[in-house]
Structures are given as C-alpha cells and as structure tokens.
C-alpha cells in the first residue's frame, strides 16, 4: 500500500501489539513520507503505511457496523484534520446500524447499515467541509 492511495476518512486495519487487528480512521496524511495519523477514538498516533492491513472502503460484505466495536462505550469520537468531529454510536440489535453525528452543537445523526455506505458519507462530508 502507498500513501498516495489513501484518503482522509479511509477506514483501515491496523496491526495491534498482540498480533491482532483493529479498525481506525485515517485522520491526516503527512506529506513528509509514508506516514499517516490514525486513531482509536480520540487517541491519534502516527502509523507507517507498511503497517496498514488494507483499506476497508470497498468491502461491501462487511455489513454489520455494530460488530466493528463492542457496545460497551456509548460513543466513539474522532477528530479529523480541519476540526471535523464525528461520533459513532454502535446500535446492536435487529437492524445493526450505526449512527454518526457531526459537530458539538445541534448534532445531526445519520443511520448507516453498511460500512461502505458510511465510508462514502464520511468522504463527502470531509470534501464539503474543507
């Protein structure tokens, strides 16, 4: 994988220390090499592109967004370059959807059943906002 193949808002797999895998958002791409900033909630960290396990964007079969996270936390908040804040609230149940909202004031929630659907919404929001 190459940095030029990535976009802000991409959902990527990251290797964990115990050889597991977690999913993160790309929040910023540094221009000085093969490094991007990703996060698990509001804990951003630098990540070399060689450690990425692949972009999840076009994986239509990954349908259960509620399975992405356990539902012990109410919301997972991500802050992107330029100040775009998104909160993800997994809803586990009959429909398995996720609600996402933008901003601190008068948040607007949108429902998503498919990860792919959420990915396109995120790309569009980032493109329109900045």
Q: How does the language model describe each region?
A:
Residues 31-50, 69-113:
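Acidic, low-complexity, intrinsically disordered interaction modules
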Residues 18-19, 64, 96:
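Detector for Asparagine
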Residues 11, 19-32:
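Short beta-strand-centered aromatic/proline hotspots
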Residues 41-68, 110-128:
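Intrinsically disordered, low-complexity, charged/polar segments
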Residues 1-3:
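Short alpha-helix capping/helix-loop boundary micro-motifs
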């Amino acid at each position: 994988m190459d940095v030029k193949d990535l976009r802000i808002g991409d959902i990527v797999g990251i290797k964990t220390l115990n050889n597991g895998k977690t999913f993160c958002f790309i929040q910023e791409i540094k221009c000085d090499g093969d490094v991007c900033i990703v996060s698990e909630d509001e804990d951003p960290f630098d990540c070399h592109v060689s450690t990425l396990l692949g972009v999840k964007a076009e994986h239509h079969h990954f349908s259960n967004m509620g399975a992405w996270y356990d539902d012990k936390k109410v919301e997972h908040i991500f802050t992107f370059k330029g100040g775009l804040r998104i909160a993800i609230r997994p809803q586990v149940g009959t429909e398995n959807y996720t609600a996402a909202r933008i901003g601190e004031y008068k948040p607007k929630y949108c429902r998503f059943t498919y990860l792919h659907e959420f990915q396109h919404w995120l790309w569009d929001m980032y493109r329109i906002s900045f």
